[in-house]
Amino acid sequence: CAAVHGDRLLLQPAEGAPLPAFDARSYSRPKDFVPARAADRITIDADAVVGDLCIRRVAAGDRFAPFGMPKGTKLVSDYLTDRHRSVLEKQAATVVCDERGIVWLVGETVDRRVAVHRSTQTILDIRLLPPDREA
């Protein structure tokens, strides 16, 4: 599921699973840091990630705390419904998780607990690899 290549971590699903591959790098937060604002890339607080990361499809009952939602959690299915996603898009939704739960609803938003804050010292930059770059 994960392989180290130099200073990079390549996250990949189990063999045979139709999931995308990701590239992840961590680095010290620069003074002029600006969070990534792309559907295929996130920058999060590396120290807020607990344990290993894994990639999987959304499961029934999955909950997370979308960045920007001040309190509580929301079902991923409700979040996607609120954004007018089709049933097919919901079924294909992918998440990156750590041991505590969802870190990133891919293509949508990060979980509030891993968002970069003023006190963040180490950034974890995760990006979706294009299909032609998957290993």
What are these regions (language model features)?
Residues C1-A135:
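AMP-forming adenylation/ATP pyrophosphatase catalytic core
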